Amino acid sequence: MRILCLDIGNSRVGVAISDPLKITAQPVMTIELRNKDLFEELDKIFQGYNIEKVVIGYPLSKLHPDQKDEKLKKIDEISEKIGSRYNVEIVKWDERFSTKAVERVIDEELNWKRKKKIIDKVAAVYILQGYLDFYNGS
């Protein structure tokens, strides 16, 4: 059984998956939302892997706890659909600063277009690895 991670953005979704022992996270893909349907792509992923849980990168807001911005509402809506469609546990994991941390690590030599594709899936790896480390008590 594996854990899938999604880093949901406005135009792209970074996807990462754990190894079967749930120790390490690997990048899977970046889904370009303007060109592809998120759930068609997720259907393929769920068919290819035995997934028991989905970790969703959740940008904990600086707003009052009772307030949610549009991005959080979108993530909540997608999370609910994923949970019911695939009958999996959903875990929302703090992803604040994950993209910024990954941007610092990625080689500055990459052109911006290539960098954007890599950043999203590597951000998903960063989020999932943080969750796996917590999950495994590391």
Curated annotation (Swiss-Prot):
Keyword annotations of the record: Cytoplasm, Hydrolase, Nuclease, Ribosome biogenesis
InterPro entries from the UniProt entry: RNaseH-like_sf, YqgF, YqgF/RNaseH-like_dom, YqgF/RNaseH-like_dom_sf
Molecular-function GO terms, alphabetical: nuclease activity
Top-level EC class: hydrolase
Subcellular location: Cytoplasm
Gene Ontology cellular component annotations, sorted alphabetically: cytosol
Entries under SUPFAM superfamilies matching the protein: Ribonuclease H-like
Pfam families associated with the record: RuvX
Disulphide bond pairs: none
Taxonomy, superkingdom: Bacteria
EC number(s) per entry: 3.1.-.-
A biological-process GO annotation: rRNA 5'-end processing
Keyword Hydrolase set for record: yes
Main location group: cytoplasm
Similarity field: Belongs to the YqgF nuclease family.
Function of the protein: Could be a nuclease involved in processing of the 5'-end of pre-16S rRNA.
Protein name in UniProt: Putative pre-16S rRNA nuclease
Organism from which the protein derives: Caldicellulosiruptor bescii (strain ATCC BAA-1888 / DSM 6725 / KCTC 15123 / Z-1320) (Anaerocellum thermophilum)
